[in-house]
Regions:
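Bacterial N-terminal signal peptides that target proteins for export
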Residues: 2-13
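Bacterial N-terminal signal peptides
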Residues: 11-21
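Short proline/glycine- and basic residue-enriched helix-capping loop/turn segments at helix->loop/beta transitions
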Residues: 28-69, 95-148
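Short, ordered coil/turn segments that flank beta-strands lining enzyme active or ligand-binding pockets
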Residues: 74
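A short acidic/small-residue loop/turn micro-motif
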Residues: 55-56, 85-91
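Sec/Tat signal peptide C-region and signal peptidase I cleavage site
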Residues: 22-26
Length: 149
C-alpha cells in the first residue's frame, strides 16, 4: 500500500470515528438548565402522566420526593433518565423514573433549533398541606449544578 492511500485510509477511519462520537459529544456538552428555567428552552406538552404506583413498599406513605435527571433530546423526549436523589429512602424511585420518562416537550420560541438540554424534575409524594413543610421537603431534592441558564 502506498503512502497516499494509507493516509486516505487513516483519514477515512478518523472521519468515521468522529461521526460516531458526535451524538455522544452533543449529549455531554448539552447545557445544564434548572427546572425553574426549563421553560426558556422546552415546554412540557403532557401535563398529566400515568404511573403505576405499587400498593406497598418502603416509606410509601411518608412525605417525600425523588429527583430525576435527564436530557431533553432534540425531539423533545427525555433520554438517560436517572434517579439522582430519594428523600426519604423509599420504593418510589421507579415510579418517579417512569413519570419522567413519559414527559414530552415542545421547543420554546427561543429554542427554534431544538437545542438538547440537561435538566431534572422533582417528583413529590404525599406532601403535607403546610406550605413551609412542603418547601422543606422539595428543597431536600434539589440537585446542584443546574443553574447555568
Amino acid at each position: 500500500m502506498n503512502t497516499k492511500s494509507r493516509r486516505l485510509n487513516q483519514t477515512l477511519v478518523l472521519a468515521l470515528a468522529m461521526a460516531g462520537a458526535t451524538p455522544l459529544l452533543a449529549q455531554s456538552q448539552a447545557r445544564m438548565v434548572s427546572p425553574e428555567q426549563i421553560q426558556s428552552y422546552w415546554l412540557m406538552l403532557n401535563t398529566k402522566v400515568d404511573a403505576d404506583v405499587p400498593n406497598s413498599g418502603r416509606n410509601m406513605d411518608k412525605p417525600g420526593c425523588v429527583a430525576v435527571s435527564y436530557m431533553i433530546g432534540s425531539d423533545g423526549v427525555p433520554q438517560n433518565v436517572t434517579v439522582r436523589k430519594v428523600v426519604p429512602q423509599s420504593d418510589l424511585d421507579a415510579v418517579a423514573k417512569s413519570v419522567a420518562s413519559n414527559f414530552r416537550y415542545g421547543p420554546s420560541l427561543k429554542n427554534s433549533s431544538h437545542e438538547p438540554v440537561n435538566t431534572y424534575f422533582i417528583v413529590p409524594f404525599n406532601l403535607p398541606a403546610d406550605a413551609a413543610q412542603r418547601q422543606s421537603i422539595i428543597s431536600a431534592c434539589k440537585l446542584p449544578g443546574y443553574d447555568q441558564a
